[in-house]
């Protein structure tokens, strides 16, 4: 038996009372007629600024337009050609200090609260926190 199996066996043997899963059929999920509009509204309510990029619009030019004074831009996304730092190739997280704009990719926007799921797809996730401004491509 593996160490994991030993741990799980000990854990299961110490469960004194077992409960059935509750019936969730009475719960009605929240739905929105216009989920994108709801996401944009909620994001603005919590301090975000949503910009819908047109199909052929250059993201690099848009970032330069939005942040004209930005000198240090960090991103590991292949479509971002204006990045001066790559969070995958720096020696340590401290090297991201002084980043004006961090550009990352979000995977899922939540209409209910304007949150965005951002998986760690970079070596140094500090870019998400240390940047003065963050651009999330969704």
Give the residues covered by each predicted segment.
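The feature marks the mature, well-folded catalytic cores of soluble enzymes
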Residues: 1-138
